[in-house]
Amino acid sequence: MDDLSGKVAVVTGGAAGIGRGIVEALLEEGVRVVIADVEASVLDDTLKGLHPLGQVRGVVTDVSSAASVEALADDVFATEGACHLLFNNAGVTSGGGGRPWEQEPNDWTWCFSVNVFGVANGMLSFVPRMIESGLPGVVVNTSSMDGGIAPVPYASVYASSKAAISCLTEALAHQLSAACTQLRAAVFYPSGGLLDTGLWTAQRNRPPELARLKPRPPAPGTTFAEFKAQLEAAGRSVDVVDLLELGRFVVRGVKAGDFIIGHGLEEAGAMLHARADAIAEGRLPPAALS
């Protein structure tokens, strides 16, 4: 898919962070973009800033709700006539800390409802219609190096959800190919440095019915600014990712036909080799640290 001009894209979680970077990069390519986001006020503010850049509109959507995503698909196909690019990008953290035994059921439900079921809902509502259209298209699911490649121990639930996305996307890609469709799938691993996204404060959108029964006090380093300051105080070099450049990187990967889109894949490959060696020998794989 070399020329994206005039194509229609849907980006979930597109009002801020990585999603907004992808949206801006798509607009640069002449793509008509529909942003799906759960935060109406943030979505409105984002649209005001993006309207001068191209054809873009928003639909308030809760990706954890199958009905909400189905309504989004109804809107897109009725209004735009097609969907060529679907970016299942919305994501959250569990908010329960790192130790698996300290996570509450609501932590698991909250994280998986957005990160896993959000992707599944997008697939279920859009992919059959995209196949039926007979048009070339791409489904891009946002995973993470944390879980998608190797789990970081202090983010156990989040890592588990991202591992699920990687497995689902790989299965989707094989099935789309076997069915001889015009669609393909790709998995995106955001990387390249420290990411200043809404993931740091994702708990602001957590539904009351999924609140923790035992609230946790904010831990040091739980915001982007705090974590960045901690790294700098420890003498570590901090590279903050330009989210628009990251969005452009994703779009280039889509145009190139890549299945895996991400920086630092050689390093990830070395990590996977170490994991594979450990698994082959029956050992616990080495912990990934970020």
Enumerate the predicted regions with their spans.
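SDR active-site lid
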Residues: 177-261
